[in-house]
Amino acid sequence: MVSRRNFLSGSGAALLGAALVSKAGAASLPEAPTMTTAAMQPPLVPPAGRPYTPVATLNGWSLPWRMKNGWKEFHLIAEPVVRELAPGMSAHLWGYNGQAPGPTIEAVEGDKVRIFVTNRLPEYTTVHWHGMLLPCGMDGVGGLTQPHIPPGKTFVYEFQLEKHGTFMYHPHADEMVQMAMGMMGSFIVHPKDPGVMRVDRDFVFIMSAYDIDPGSFTPRVNEMTDFNIWTWNARVFPGIDALPVRAGDRVRIRVGNLTMTNHPIHLHGYQFEVVGTDGGWIQPSARWPEVTADVAVGQMRAIEFTANRPGDWAFHCHKSHHTMNAMGHQVPNLIGVPQQDLAKRINRLVPDYMAMGSTGGSMGGMEMPLPDNTLPMMAGTGPFGALEMGGMFSVVKVREGLGRNDYRDPGWFRHPQGTVAYEYTGELPG
C-alpha cells in the first residue's frame, strides 16, 4: 500500500511503482513455497484451458501461483540459502524460496501478474525483470524507479505481460554482491496462441559463476574475472542433471547468462537453430544451422532441434576451463617434466602428495585427499570409464519409447552392435 505522504511527495512508490505491502495486505499474501532438493522437478502442468508446454528447469523448479480477481499472484522470498553445487560441495548463497537460482516463473502472454517480494536478507534489495516490457516504476532499479525493499518488508510488482519469450529476474540493488551471491532466476512467458512456437520439450537454465576457495563456503563477491566454479543453475558436473528427450520430439533449450563472460554453448550430434534472443523470436527465414551458440553477458538465447538421433550427446560450454571444477585452476604446466625425485622428497613432508601433469592433465585414474567442501578438477564416470568433466557439462539423452511426460534419467545409452569406436589390432596402412 502507498501512504498518502509518499504519494504526494512522488517518492517512486506511487501508483505505477513497486509498492510496500501494508500489514493488512500481508495477511492475504499468496503462499511462498520453498524447495530444498537440487534435482530437476517435473514441469508445472498448466491449468485446463491454457495449453502450453511447461518448461523443465535444469536442477530447478517452477513457482506455483494463485489466481485472485484476474491477477496471477506469485510470492518470492529473497533469503540466504545453502546450495549443493555437486555431491561433496555446497555454497552459502543468497537466492529465492530456498534455492539459488530462484524458481522459474511461468505465465502466459496477456496475463496480469502480481509478484510479492519479501526481503529476508540482511540488506535491502529489489527485483529487476530483465528484458521485459513493463511500466517504468515496475522495472526494479533501486533508487531510480522505486525505493529499495528494506529487510523484513514486502513489496509488490504489478504488470501485464506484453510479449512472450525468455526473460530473467535479478536484483538491481547492491548488484555486484547480490548477483555474485546467486540472486537470479528465469521468467518464461508462453504465447497466448498455443500453436505459436510449440515444442514437445522445453528446458531452461541460467549460467552463473562463483569464486569459492577450497574449504570455504561463501563466494568472494569482489572477484571480476578469475572464477573457479562455472555453473548451470548453480550446479556443476557431475551434479548437473541430464536432459532426457523422446526420439522425434521438437526440443527447445533456453539459456540465460548472468556470469561475467560469454559462453559458447555446444551440442554434440545435432545441428540446431537459434530461434530466440533477448528481443524475441527469430523468424524461420532468418535462422541458420549452428552447433555452437555464443551467449554473451546478460543475454538469453533459445535453441531448437528435432531429436532424431538417439544416444547420449554431450552438451557443454566450449571454453575448456569452464568444464573444470575448483581444483583445476592456477596449476603450472608440468608436461614433460620428470617428477619422480621431486615427488619422493615432497612425500617425506606430505605423505599424500601425488605428482600430476608430467604426461598431461588426465585425472581419470587418480584419487587423492581433497580439502573440505571442494571438488576434483574433473569427475564423473560414464559407461566406458572416466568422463573427466566438470563445470558446465551435461548430457542430452535421446531415447525411443520415453514417456511424453517422463523426465527421469533413462540411464546410459545402449549402442547398437558395431557402432562404438574400438581398438584396431590389424596391420597399419603404410
Predicted regions and their residues:
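Copper-binding active sites and cupredoxin-like electron-transfer domains
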Residues: 2-430
